[in-house]
Amino acid sequence: MSGLPLLSLAIWVPIFSGLVVLLTGSDRNSPLARLLALLGAIVGLLVTLPLYTGFDTTSPAMQFVELMPWIRRFNINYHLGVDGISMLFVILNSFITIIVVIAGWKVIESKVAQYNAGFLIMSGLLNGIFAALDGMLFYVFFEASLIPLYLIIGVWGGPRRVYAAFKFFLFTLMGSLLFLISLIYLYRYSGGSFAIQAWQQMPIPMIPQQWLFLAFLVAFAVKVPMWPVHTWLPDAHVEAPTGGSIVLAAIALKLGAYGFLRFSLPIAPDASHEFSWLILGLSLIAVVYIGFVALVQEDMKKLVAYSSIAHMGFVTLGFFIFSPLGMEGALVQMVSHGFIAGAMFYCIGVMYDRVHSRMIVDYGGVVNTMPKFAAFFMLFAMANAGLPGTSGFVGEFMVILASVKFNFWVAFAAASTMILGAAYTLWMYKRVVFGAVGNHHVEELTDITSREFLVLTLLAIGALGMGLYPQPFTEVMHSSVDELLRHISVSKIQ
């Protein structure tokens, strides 16, 4: 199977499956659309698994490389490859696609084919982002992935879905304009090449590095999102359907952080070191201030959305400490957040489907009518708070340890988020699951169905498996992280 174009399959199998699902047409064929979507998502995951089993963990080089000309006039190539960093996100994305298809199985009743096709097409585009080694190819996938998510929020979202979708699209597009200008500059500066690896190797004077870094920062900070360009995220999460929130939290938020690793750090290493104080400051604001903001939320989705911003603050903090432990911890946190945030939003969706409210005050006593759900919800709430034994603990602990070696006060501020995380997550859990019943609908609730049990079990396996045995994840990324840090430790100024 190693001779197959695995990365092309990871991209085009979901996209082709989405187009096939679209052909089922009206909602009269919705059972067929759901079945084809699930089949396409499963095949999409299966074609990514050989990336892991056939991966050489001792090599930092790009593997499973595919290269062919695309637009010869501008030297734009269809150039794909993965290393120990990007490969994990291709597999995570394909896994999450199965989750969202199952999650929307009986929940979405209108435009079922279009809904499922949107997720499948977006899955392929996201895999393209993680695999692209050509700057323009990366940009095409990067921008195209906005369209399905925009439609998912705008068509199947809540009452303010159009506002939320437009705000999401506008914020991201503004950052992307500077990103495009940077790509064109690098193309001209390199003598007419869009090869990302060539950009990473060529010397660049300090002033252009600074401008490139700041342009990349604007583009990727919106995607993470970092404070203060985070305001689109709570609105998008609140209005998005459950599947949209899962993909947004589990995968889409990783694009900005991934951009730092592929562009900011290796292309502008001197500027990255010079502006590291800025990133560390913004990261600590996200970790501490946004944690306090989450503490006062009454809407469960908004609370988890703000907690995602705080958790992603750990990621950018880990990157710009410039240590192997910090960067590996940040990457573990990214993968872990995919399981945990996806599970938290799914748990909220399970309750919303029954009570049609996201407000904490409308719940209470859920454990009495939904004991199985309460047990799953407790597991994911504890993981979100960073309980040892769950994946939420591993990445945060690694970043905090790296921070201690870097600066005690940075580590102290970062560690405070574990207290804040426990406070706002367990406060929400206590009021929703225990206490007095706040809504007569709660008294009539039925426990989770077999479909919901399956989704929660799959996510629980991810959160617990990674928490109890993280080595399969860290082992894969170790060589790539070491090579990246070695690369950015050498000045490119000549």
What are these regions (language model features)?
Residues 99-107, 124-136, 149-428:
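Hydrophobic transmembrane alpha-helices and their helix-loop junctions in integral membrane proteins
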Residues 9-29, 218, 225:
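N-terminal signal-anchor/start-transfer transmembrane helix
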